[in-house]
Amino acid sequence: EPYDVLDIFQENGFAIVADDLAQETRNFRQDVPDDDDALMALARAWNEFDGCSLATDANKPKGQMIIDAVKKYGADAVVVCMMKFCDPEEFDYPILLQEFEAAGVKNLYIEVDQESTAFEQVKTRIQTFAEIL
């Protein structure tokens, strides 16, 4: 996520206890096993990859995985930093929201853009959320 957004979290007293970033932690959640056919091993690992909107999975376990992480790490809330125009993640968000609300997990949705340099709207939303918590 853009560093400016991380600074806004810090300024408002947030501590990030876990993340589920598609190009970060999610990539390291499981190892690709050693195999003579490296491409086949990579394909099998991708086929068995749970909790990623980019990987087709009719069971949609991502919401429960995040809820489990909230409990494991004692998080007060979940902040969904949605990368603009990431259709697979945007498509799954209503499912996540429904699961968060059913589990009583407080949550905030913000849109971010890697190219953005202005974060005033995001800052206002995070400040308001901090006051609610």
Q: Can you name each region flagged by the protein language model?
A:
Residues 23, 84, 112-116:
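Short beta-alpha junction loops
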Residues 58-74, 91-92:
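A short, acidic, amphipathic alpha-helical segment used as a generic capping/interface helix at domain edges
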Residues 93-133:
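Peripheral docking tails and interdomain loops at the edges
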Residues 57, 86-90, 115-119:
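Acidic-and-aromatic substrate-binding clefts and catalytic sites of carbohydrate-active enzymes
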Residues 1-66:
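Redox- and metal-dependent alpha/beta enzyme cores, enriched for Fe-S-associated oxidoreductases
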